């Protein structure tokens, strides 16, 4: 009996071990296959992008050299065009389209994607004019002088108007570093501005809009504009000694992203603005850009318990998330 019991126990143990090893092999196979598929996909994507970059690189290099010839001896003018005028053109072009919807409610199909339903329908014209004046002041009297002072530092560090354009892989590396630096500097400067000492006199101005619109992304006290808007974006290119082409693309991208974060519409195929929109609604959650530091510091715990968190995804269809994931009746009231 003891022998049979021991034999059965041994068989059972062998079966369990076999099951465990089988599970481990299946897991390893699935993970390995997934990893290989991801690497193959990523290599394919980067190969096609690099091929496109390389094929068009000759064209852009020729155009860049033509610009250098045109502005020879006056590269600082070229720098100001690329670092200020082009990003501002992107900012106002995009916000011009959004302002049409904000002020008229048309086209109707875009209004369906509004995050805070019933707010800014239409936007208060007096409040809007005041905000636009502040944004223009910040751009002309704060951003422009900061870029003026930035140029000699970049010139000393690596010459932003050097003849050779950056490679595709180098620009991707720069973009990753710019994003990381912006996340760190913006998160901590933003949290600092929420300290009672600074909030009432400085940051409260930006939070006048509890339901934000795109153009108010730069609506802020001048001190906040320097510390929390400009510095997080400028430090990256300064550290990397970046080329003007990288600076132009980064500044333009940063302005478009912050506009989307404040626009008040969760539009298809664009980054989700739910995270920062919730910050304007509640004030004490979601301080960062990417949400990484909010996760580490626990400043997104309330957000994760809301419908807004469920909606914080890339919308890949045309059905508004307010319809597919409706708010609870309590909030709708």
Swiss-Prot record:
* Keyword hit for Hydrolase: no
Q: How does it sit in the membrane?
A: Multi-pass membrane protein
Q: Which domain of life does the protein's organism represent?
A: Eukaryota
Q: Where in the cell is it found?
A: Cytoplasm; Membrane
GO BP terms in the entry = lipid biosynthetic process; positive regulation of megakaryocyte differentiation; positive regulation of protein phosphorylation
Keyword Membrane: yes or no?
yes
Protein's name according to its UniProt entry: Fatty acid hydroxylase domain-containing protein 2
The lineage is: Eukaryota, Metazoa, Chordata, Craniata, Vertebrata
- Report the gene name: FAXDC2
């Amino acid at each position: 009996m003891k022998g049979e019991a021991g034999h059965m126990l041994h068989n059972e143990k062998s079966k369990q071990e076999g099951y465990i090893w089988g599970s481990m092999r299946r897991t390893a196979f699935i993970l390995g296959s997934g990893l290989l598929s991801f690497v193959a996909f990523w290599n394919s994507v980067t190969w096609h992008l690099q091929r496109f970059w390389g094929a068009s690189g000759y064209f852009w290099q020729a155009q860049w050299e033509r610009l250098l010839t045109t502005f020879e001896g006056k590269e600082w003018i070229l720098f100001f065009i690329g670092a200020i005028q082009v990003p501002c053109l992107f900012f106002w072009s995009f916000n011009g389209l959004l302002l049409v919807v904000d002020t008229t409610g048309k086209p109707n199909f875009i209004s369906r994607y509004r995050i805070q339903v019933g707010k800014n329908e239409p936007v208060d014209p007096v409040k809007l004019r005041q905000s636009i004046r502040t944004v223009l002041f910040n751009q002309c009297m704060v951003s422009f002088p900061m870029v003026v002072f930035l140029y000699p530092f970049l010139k000393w560090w690596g010459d932003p108007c050097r003849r050779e354009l950056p490679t595709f892989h180098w620009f991707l590396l720069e973009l990753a570093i710019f994003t990381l630096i912006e996340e760190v500097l913006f998160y901590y400067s933003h949290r600092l501005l929420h300290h009672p000492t600074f909030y009432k006199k400085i940051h409260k101005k930006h939070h006048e809009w509890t339901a934000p619109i795109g153009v108010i992304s730069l609506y802020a006290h001048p001190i906040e504009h320097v510390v929390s808007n400009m510095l997080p974006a400028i430090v990256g290119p300064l550290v990397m000694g970046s080329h003007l082409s990288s600076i132009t693309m980064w500044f333009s991208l940063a302005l478009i992203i912050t506009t989307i974060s404040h626009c008040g519409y969760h539009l298809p195929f664009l980054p989700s603005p739910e995270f920062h929109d919730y910050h304007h609604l509640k004030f004490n959650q979601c301080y960062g850009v990417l949400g990484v530091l909010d996760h580490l510091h626990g400043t997104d715990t309330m957000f994760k318990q809301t419908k807004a968190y469920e909606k914080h995804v890339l919308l890949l269809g045309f059905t508004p998330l307010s319809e597919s994931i409706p708010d609870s009746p309590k909030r709708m009231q």
